[in-house]
């Protein structure tokens, strides 16, 4: 049986990446620091995924195990030494924390003489995630390890898309996911091109697809949350049931479409259909997606290269409309949740400093005209 190591045994890891790896015939070693999840994986050796649609079918994922990377790093290194593929779903901010362990695993492959090509795919909500991880891993590799990695270890970037809402079940491994999923991998950085996963798309140039996903799904999803919060909606479905909110989301997606078509020459009709499907996904009555989950960490989401400011910058450069995105950014600055540290911090910054200074600090912008435009909407 083929072997995989997956960092991150959370809902996305189990409910998306784990399902695909299982369907491709892999044994999966889930690596995490959550002892409850790791214990359950080792005790049961399987878990169930429910598809959030009419009929609510279930998939049983078997041949799984767990490794606590904090308690047993040596087991992770051993697993990396023999594995056929490595994936992650831990969040962009956590990637640097697994770099040293990955480097030790790569060194172990070198010492053992394992020259089977291996690809490491960071399945995160970020542009260039795998290459970012590689830069972190390189810091811990010996000169020999660097040469070995250059020859045998690939870090192809990936774009992933599946809505997995926050949830809690008596069975800690059980997870509910939406029917839709998309996983795209760039081919040019693959070291093991013969290992092709079914239900995964492979593209020579990934950047258009990553931007299509981040600027469409992430921007649209977040827009529904921040506007929804402004109007008192508690779930994304509730937000979409408000015609005013739905219309605003569609207006934001129209601006995103104009950017993607101008920049990447996407087919207009295909992109319109892609955005129609996004709206349908957000309206899924079988998913309870809390506004508070989608709207959390507003400071991060207002970043220079994030889902709002980056498309706004690029639309401005192309002299295309971004008025609806600007309005949404205003709602992001207004968002408050007592349980979200970043939203509280954002409120504190606005109370202590001028709005303009906070906009500059949070967005990293130096375009004075654009800064003033954002200030007008706060």
From Swiss-Prot:
Top-rank EC class of the record's enzyme: oxidoreductase
An example Gene Ontology biological process: mannitol catabolic process
PROSITE patterns per record: MANNITOL_DHGENASE (PS00974)
Annotated Gene Ontology cellular component terms: cytosol
Entry keywords, A to Z: NAD, Oxidoreductase
One matching Pfam family: Mannitol_dh
Superkingdom field: Bacteria
The EC number(s) this enzyme carries: 1.1.1.17
InterPro entries in the record: 6-PGluconate_DH-like_C_sf (IPR008927), 6PGD_dom2 (IPR013328), Mannitol_1_phos_5_DH (IPR023028), Mannitol_DH (IPR000669), Mannitol_DH_C (IPR013118), Mannitol_DH_CS (IPR023027), Mannitol_DH_N (IPR013131), NAD(P)-bd_dom_sf (IPR036291)
Gene Ontology terms for molecular function: mannitol-1-phosphate 5-dehydrogenase activity
Binding site residues for NAD(+): 4-15
UniProt family annotation: Belongs to the mannitol dehydrogenase family.
Protein name: Mannitol-1-phosphate 5-dehydrogenase
Provenance organism: Streptococcus pneumoniae serotype 4 (strain ATCC BAA-334 / TIGR4)
